Amino acid sequence: WNINPAKVGIMGASAGGHLASTLATHYTSKETRPDFQILLYPVITMDANFTHAGSRENLITKNPSADLIAKYSNELQVNAQTPQAFIALSSDDKAVLPQNSINYYLALLKHNVPATMHIYPTGGHGWGFRDNFTYKRQWTDELEKWLRNGVKL
């Protein structure tokens, strides 16, 4: 497969996007830091105004402390060493609000972390690799271009 173990990224969608962005922002050593992150309609924040309630409750309980909310609101954990990101979402996603991705993207830019974001007008949530997603070809082509040319390793 020609995989270079020194150049490994992480990909996650929805709650898996929270897991991926948590690894990208909470790593404890250079060896555990991914080199890039690919996030599809990710849960990012634990802020009650924008989070996915089920993900929040499963991760940090129904009545979490302010410290726990901040710790797992990954847009607040971005720093200059956070790995570069490819983010894709739909503006009509009602399950995981677009603010999750948008605020994370803005945090990446604030810390000069290379990032690209693709927002599709329709698709809702959970489109992944579904053939009936109108923008499937577009987002997979954009991801391939980014992986081949945009990722700085």
Residue ranges and their predicted role:
Residues 1-51, 69-70:
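Primarily recognizes the serine-hydrolase "nucleophile elbow" in alpha/beta-hydrolase
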Residues 42-77, 83:
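Mobile cap/lid helix-loop segments that gate and shape the active-site cleft of serine hydrolases
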Residues 14, 43, 91-93, 121:
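Residue-level signal for short, function-critical loop segments
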Residues 38-40, 86-88, 118:
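Hydrophobic/aromatic beta-strand patches that form the interior of the parallel beta-sheet core
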Residues 81, 86-89, 93:
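Short beta-strand/loop motif that positions the catalytic acidic residue
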Residues 8, 85, 115:
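Hydrophobic anchor at the start of a short beta-strand
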Residues 94-103:
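Conserved alpha/beta-hydrolase "acid-adjacent" motif
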Residues 102-153:
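C-terminal catalytic histidine-bearing segment of alpha/beta-hydrolase fold enzymes
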